[in-house]
Every structure is written in structure tokens, then in C-alpha cells.
Regions:
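Conserved C-terminal structural/oligomerization subdomain of aldehyde/semialdehyde dehydrogenase
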Residues: 7, 14-116
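Short secondary-structure junctions
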Residues: 1-5
Length: 116
């Protein structure tokens, strides 16, 4: 753990941004759905390896890929088993859009005219 990892003192239930380095695929953080500002950093050699690692979970709410190559982004979108995949940005929820998780990340969807 490089940053964060301890609850903030005081009123409320706040958790600081947390950065985890040297994360391995067999660690729970790679398989559980974490709602919080926690970023596990994992090394990979190929896009296929990264997709396999990302999909190695029962959950699939949202994913992001950062790349300068449009072909790489499109391959990632097709290969990731997530309800939403963002390119070169973090999770952003536009209320006009329909949002849905995949696998154990929820049933149905929310927002937009189809989510009402």
C-alpha cells in the first residue's frame, strides 16, 4: 500500500483514496467488487493478458481503458465483460444514459428513459 488505507478520523464514514502496488491476480481485491477509492495496480505484458485478468471476477459493473490506440480500445471493449467501458476516462455517469452492470454487478439498469 503506497497511499491511504486507513479510515479518516472524525464524524462520518470516509475512506481516503488508496493506491495498492505489487498486486497479484490471486488477491481478493482483484476478484471482489470494491466500492471506494481503491486502485490496485497490476502489471501485464499483452492486451489479452490484461483482459483475462480484468474478467477474472464474478462482477462487471464498470471498466476503463487508457490508450492512444483506437484499435486497442475497440478490442478491449469487445473483450471486457463489463456493463460499461470508458475510454481514457474514469467512471462518469450521465443521467441521460442507461446504465447496467453485468454478471453479479446488479440486475436491470438505471437512469435514462429505459431505466425508469
Amino acid at each position: 500500500m503506497v497511499l491511504g488505507g486507513k479510515a479518516v478520523a472524525g464524524k462520518g464514514y470516509y475512506y481516503p483514496p488508496t493506491l495498492l502496488l505489487d498486486v497479484r491476480q490471486d488477491m481478493a481485491i482483484m476478484h471482489e467488487e470494491t466500492f471506494g477509492p481503491v486502485l490496485p495496480v497490476v502489471s501485464f505484458d499483452t492486451l489479452e493478458q490484461a483482459l483475462t485478468m480484468a474478467n477474472d471476477s464474478d462482477y462487471g459493473l464498470t471498466s476503463s481503458i487508457y490508450t492512444q490506440n483506437l484499435n486497442t480500445a475497440m478490442k478491449a471493449i469487445k473483450g471486457l465483460k463489463f456493463g460499461e467501458t470508458y475510454i481514457n476516462r474514469e467512471n462518469f455517469e450521465a443521467m441521460q444514459g442507461f446504465h447496467a452492470g453485468w454478471r453479479k454487478s446488479g440486475i436491470g439498469g438505471a437512469d435514462g428513459k429505459h431505466g425508469l
